[in-house]
Amino acid sequence: MALADPEIVIGPGRLRGRYESGVFAFRGIPYAKPPLGELRFMSPEPPAAWDGVRDAGAFGPPAEQPPGLSGATAPRGNAFPGNSGEWLTVNVWTPDLGASGLPVMVWIHGGAYMFGSSAEPVYDGGRFAMAGVVLVTCNYRLGVEGFGQIPGAPANRGLLDLVAALRWVAENIEAFGGDPGNVTVFGESAGAGAIAALLAMDGSGDGEAAESATGSNSAGWNDASGLFRRAIAESVPGTFFTPRLAADVTSAIAEEAGVPPTYEALAAADPALLAAASARVTARMREFGRWGAVRLTDTPFSPVVDGAVLPRAPWRALLAGAARDIELLTGHNRDEYRLFIVASGRLGKITEEDAATVLDAFAPAPDGPAGYRNGHPGASPGRLFELVFSDWLFRMPTLHLAQAHAVSGGTTYLYELRAEAPALDGVLGACHGLDVPLLFGPPAPGTRPGISDMLLGGSPPASLIALGDQMRGDWIRFATDGDPGWSPYGTEHRTTRIYDMPPDVLSYPEETSMRLWQRHRFGVLELSC
């Protein structure tokens, strides 16, 4: 006999969810008011209460965005059915509405701070809930809406959305059986970068000017401390911007859209117009020499170290002791940048000139490009291109975050994923994003295509699925009691969990890259003129 649709009461009102495959699911729950009209480009405001029963059977729409690499077939922006700007929503899966004290895990999706949606099939929280976790996913503002640097508006609105979502969890998760005192945030790529920023957002920034501009007088509006106990950051990007660089990028997008780069003009512009302009600017980023190394990427948006919302870059904040009481699990995939080389059609086509360009741009002092060439004798231009991009963008920022946290006295765990994606005859290797479908598991049959199909193919081997089950179990153990099953990372022993077939525990394996980058200090990326 089928169970009736479950109903619960939270702060703003009554919700009706669904009972699906042994767990309870509630989707599209607003955690803030729609950020349009007078609230466009403002810090998030608490959601309005509602009368009667609100149906929570469908996902809310994501912020306006162009199609992206991950899950490119997912509905986006105004193409999403019923998109009326109600972008700021959460989704909750729970094993037992009558339970109490269950560990809570909050997933923050990636997508270059420009695209992505909690409605992606790969982010289904059912497997986590079946293992005894209350799993939360959320949407947040992206692109110009969330990370454009706009006069008279707070920076990092996407990060402020995430703080608001975590406050919603703290206030409401008990109704779903969760423990608000045992919350773990986890995310991948831009989601991991957002988590790194949240670790540094302790409310110490000078928010007076931003509060004046936004009218916000809510205590803790820019303070993430106390909202989560543990953090899992998968493939942390090294891109954090200065306000000048972020403002210049926003001005270029405004010019592309045909509007002045002012608050009034941008707030009056259709979100779809700005998203389309962002995509066109992304396609020609190499023309903007003043953007420095950023011009060689496809990431025109990043968190902004503005001194108010985000006081310091995460590496420096953690080294100074920020978030020392937060237990951190972080790691990366071995072949991070391979995904982007394959997706761009450049596999096997990288020239010596291409390799020299990125080595000159990214290889750190004192060795510079020679360090990579000497450290990898006989490596092809394509291999050098991939290595330095992987290191600069993901691998070394992740390692340095782990080191900063460990040196300051924080409990830190490190991993590297080495198992390879089976799709496309294995050319992707252990590429960026592979950890996501492994953790969440393959979507149900008949689900629309997405990143799982792109990376795992139609019939992934049982051994790879089992490895994903093990990773999920380790993540859940960490979220439950802080112990994923291997020893903490330290600068002497560098203990690292290797997710391969079979798994292992070794000293950090990327020794050449670690040595080349040991004197580098990740911080903020500047405008070059």
What are these regions (language model features)?
Residues 1-156, 216, 297, 449-485, ...:
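Non-catalytic accessory segments of hydrolases
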Residues 65-80, 122-124, 130, 154-155, ...:
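A structural signal for the main folded, soluble domain(s) of proteins
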Residues 28, 70-263, 285, 317-340:
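Serine-hydrolase-like catalytic core of hydrolytic proteins
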Residues 21, 25-49, 342-362, 489-495:
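Short Gly/aromatic-enriched secondary-structure transition segments
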Residues 485-509:
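Mature extracytoplasmic/periplasmic domains
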Residues 105, 134-137, 163-166, 170, ...:
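Non-transmembrane alpha-helical segments in soluble domains
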Residues 97-101, 173-182, 260-261, 405-413, ...:
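Surface-exposed helix-capping loop/turn segments at secondary-structure junctions
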Residues 265, 274-461, 474:
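Substrate-gating cap/lid region and adjacent catalytic-acid/histidine neighborhood
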